[in-house]
């Protein structure tokens, strides 16, 4: 006998938690069930050590504003990401202010920096600063080529550096470090208190559509072969990180045809020595190597996890064919079907430089990887650093009418035409933009309900519907308020 519920959220990460809280705030009478394959929430990509924890607001990530062929830098994409992050930040602040989250310990003020180390990159960074400083959301950004000034911002990165090496840096004091695992756990605890059912150790075996339009999920208990649970729902969200593609394929919706995925592992060096970690307080992003994918931009980060400061450097690309860190090596081969084989082959052929880059990364020894760290922190001691494996990222491959198939970076919502099912595919900037992503998903799936949500959404997100960059006075007011509530 199937257990009926209004909403099923598959995946216990930041996306399901965010959507769950939004729906509970906007439709408090709806019954919601959250399913997670592991024994608790936030154990995969949302876990603090499985992502970089950057509050992606385009302050330091150079790949969000590349140099155009005409020599001009367009800040439009960076502004879009910054606006989205501020929507998330407002939502979190409201939940803290209303007592729906335990505290604001999930977010910390950590300056964001960009550091480059050759003349061409220094010239680019100057142009980027010139393009950004006129924008409201980037008005407090600083730029310098003065070694002493840069040393004040990031002393470890300048100590022992060749005096003749050109350097330039951007610095933004309003950057953040976010523990998305802690945030997810606080959100889910609130949901449980509101009657949301959480089912852990549940693997989705099958997804079927019934004649009346309801979705039926057959799930198995990963600890007990006889522990079957069947759920029947009118709305299904597939937010299982890298596992969402497999679930989307199981659903059989036509909108999911032609999608494929390519998994990339992330490796980082971690330093937990308090003496070293205490001397660096910034997230410092550099320039990606030629041919490298956007998620490979090197960065030396301050991380605040469970009240302790650490340093992380990376990422280094790795490859395993599983779509989740605790997934199966058969995930990739079993995801290849007739409808996505051609797009995947086309995307692979068109991205040979990326393939060569990944192969080169896989061949690197630990010593060769550490040499990259020395470029950013010249006096780093190998004994202080351990190499850790972060979460899996599954890059989207989708069919394209002109190219056959394209590799797409970022995140994408794939929804059934009638709004009864939606999946979230992709990676960065991901968690930082969870709130605007889930609001967009809700409007796409429940267009008839959207007008009745407007008033409450404006309470949850005070700047809802407003471009902060285009409304300076409102931006000052909202940014100051969220900074005060979140203590950042």
Swiss-Prot record:
One of its GO terms (molecular function) is 2-hydroxyglutarate dehydrogenase activity. Its cofactor is FAD. It comes from Neisseria meningitidis serogroup C (strain 053442). It is an enzyme of class 1 (oxidoreductase). The keyword Transmembrane does not apply. Belongs to the MQO family. It comes from the Bacteria. Its EC number is 1.1.5.4. NCBIfam families: mal_quin_oxido (TIGR01320), PRK05257.1-1 (NF003603), PRK05257.1-4 (NF003605), PRK05257.2-1 (NF003606), PRK05257.2-5 (NF003609), PRK05257.3-1 (NF003610), PRK05257.3-2 (NF003611), PRK13339.1 (NF009875). The gene is mqo. One of its GO terms (biological process) is tricarboxylic acid cycle. It catalyses: (S)-malate + a quinone = a quinol + oxaloacetate. This is Probable malate:quinone oxidoreductase. Pathway: Carbohydrate metabolism; tricarboxylic acid cycle; oxaloacetate from (S)-malate (quinone route): step 1/1. Keywords: FAD, Flavoprotein, Oxidoreductase, Tricarboxylic acid cycle. It holds the Pfam family Mqo.
């Amino acid at each position: 006998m199937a257990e009926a519920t209004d909403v099923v959220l598959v995946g216990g990460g930041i996306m399901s938690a965010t959507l769950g809280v939004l729906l509970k705030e906007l439709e408090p009478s709806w019954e919601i069930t959250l399913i997670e394959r592991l024994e608790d929430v936030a154990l995969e990509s949302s876990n603090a050590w499985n992502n970089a924890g950057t509050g992606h607001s385009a302050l330091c990530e150079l790949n969000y504003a590349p140099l155009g062929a005409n020599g001009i830098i367009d800040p439009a994409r960076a502004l879009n990401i910054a606006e989205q992050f501020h929507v998330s930040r407002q939502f979190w602040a409201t939940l803290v202010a209303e007592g729906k989250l335990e505290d604001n310990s999930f977010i910390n003020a950590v300056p964001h920096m960009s550091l480059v180390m050759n003349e061409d990159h220094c010239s680019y960074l100057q142009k980027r600063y010139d393009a950004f400083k006129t924008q409201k959301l980037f008005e407090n950004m600083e730029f310098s080529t003065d070694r002493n000034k840069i040393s004040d911002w990031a002393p470890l990165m300048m100590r022992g550096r060749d005096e003749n090496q050109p350097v330039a840096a951007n610095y933004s004091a309003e950057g953040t470090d976010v523990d998305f695992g802690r945030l997810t756990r606080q959100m889910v605890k609130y949901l449980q208190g509101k009657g949301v059912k959480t089912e852990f150790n549940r693997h989705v075996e099958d997804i079927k559509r019934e004649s009346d339009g309801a979705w039926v999920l057959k799930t198995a208990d990963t600890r007990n072969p006889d522990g079957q649970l069947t759920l029947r729902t009118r709305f299904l969200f597939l937010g299982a990180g890298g596992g969402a593609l497999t679930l989307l394929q199981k659903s059989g919706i036509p909108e999911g045809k032609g999608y494929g995925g390519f998994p990339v592992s992330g490796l980082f060096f971690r330093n937990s020595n308090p003496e070293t970690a205490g001397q660096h307080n910034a997230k410092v992003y550099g320039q990606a190597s030629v041919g490298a994918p956007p998620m490979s931009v090197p960065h030396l980060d301050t991380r605040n996890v469970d009240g302790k400061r650490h340093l992380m450097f990376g990422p280094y690309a790795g490859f395993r064919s599983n779509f989740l860190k605790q997934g199966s090596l058969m995930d990739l081969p079993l995801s290849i079907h007739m409808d996505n084989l051609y797009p995947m082959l086309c995307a692979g052929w068109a991205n040979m430089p990326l393939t060569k880059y990944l192969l080169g990364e896989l061949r690197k020894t630990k010593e060769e990887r550490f040499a990259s760290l020395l470029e950013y922190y010249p006096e780093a001691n190998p004994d202080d650093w351990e190499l850790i494996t972060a979460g899996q990222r599954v890059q989207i491959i989708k069919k394209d009418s002109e190219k056959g198939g394209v590799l797409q970076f970022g995140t994408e919502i794939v929804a059934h035409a009638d709004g009864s099912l939606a999946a979230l595919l992709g990676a960065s900037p991901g968690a930082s933009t969870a709130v605007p992503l889930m609001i967009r998903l809700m409007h796409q799936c429940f267009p008839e309900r959207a007008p009745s949500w407007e008033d409450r959404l404006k309470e949850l997100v005070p700047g809802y519907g407003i471009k902060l960059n285009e409304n300076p006075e409102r931006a000052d007011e909202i940014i100051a308020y969220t900074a005060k509530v979140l203590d950042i």
